Amino acid sequence: MIDQAKKIYISDVTLRDGMHAIRHRYTLNHVSQIARALDEAGVDSIEVAHGDGLKGSSFNYGFGAYSDLEWISAAAEAVKQAKIATLLLPGIGTVHDLREAYDAGARVVRVATHCTEADVSRQHIEYARGLGMDTVGFLMMSHMQTPVGLAQQAKLMENYGAQCIYVVDSGGAMNMWDIAERFKALKDVLDPATQTGMHAHHNLSLGVANSLVALENGCDRVDASLTGMGAGAGNAPLEVFIAAAERMGLNHGCDVKKLINAAEDIVRPLQERPVRVDRETLALGYAGVYSSFLRHAETAAKKYNLSAFDILVELGKRRMIGGQEDMIVDVALDMAKGRVLPT
């Protein structure tokens, strides 16, 4: 049973994870308009960055239309209540980049690592705490760790100073029982003062359900995005999640109608590729593949006259993770040369 009196921290990711859906091409006007709408609707924080975090703009991940600092500044100037958050992946972004993001207006940082590599986050978490930022540990591809193993990684992040630890279903590959087991494991080892969060992807159409199950198991913060704008089939759609929470009598603090209008009037028209469950995005959840591989796999499939579905399934078989985007072309070349049989 979910505590109806407990305030759910609503973390919007339309302006960070949503970058993947449009190849990191938001204009500054888009950012201002979306941030203002989210702020007026009552969300607690708005994450802003290249889809792959601070300094993600690159040949490997895709170049952004603007710099992270320009996007963050535009969002910070547009809001009155919501905190501006950002994402940092050690090895891509540095503490110097984090300082610049802080100066531009970011007050929350999520330090993201693969679910087996929490130890690389220490420097960044400690630095963020030194700045006085709300500091979050973000364990990506959480389906690739056992619940106990994930909890051990979460404990490392807590020891470094993280105030909240996220279960991150980057592949949209987990079901409700997977989520429940991981939150129970985290709660068994973390200090009661350390919060937990849920970042869902909708590749198996379970983004909202998994977020609700997370809340049922003590989760404090929930990520979501307008129309689900995000990598793959997107994240838990914010307006849908809030509508469901409203019907359950949960304390979310948001205006449902304003979110629905922002989703339909502002965000959906920006989608060059519909953010939905289809053959390719379902492959991500089915094969347990990093959701941001989608657009890269589709590009490779077109170039080499292959099926994006088959490329994604093969990537899942090889257990590729975020940061190995260059391997998508290698897999496509192997398939084109007949070294790998189609699924």
Swiss-Prot record:
This is 4-hydroxy-2-oxovalerate aldolase. Keywords: Aromatic hydrocarbons catabolism, Lyase, Manganese, Metal-binding. The active site is at 20 (proton acceptor). Its EC number is 4.1.3.39. It comes from Pseudomonas sp. Gene3D superfamilies: 1.10.8.60, Aldolase class I. It catalyses: (S)-4-hydroxy-2-oxopentanoate = acetaldehyde + pyruvate. Catalyzes the retro-aldol cleavage of 4-hydroxy-2-oxopentanoate to pyruvate and acetaldehyde. Is involved in the meta-cleavage pathway for the degradation of 2-aminophenol.
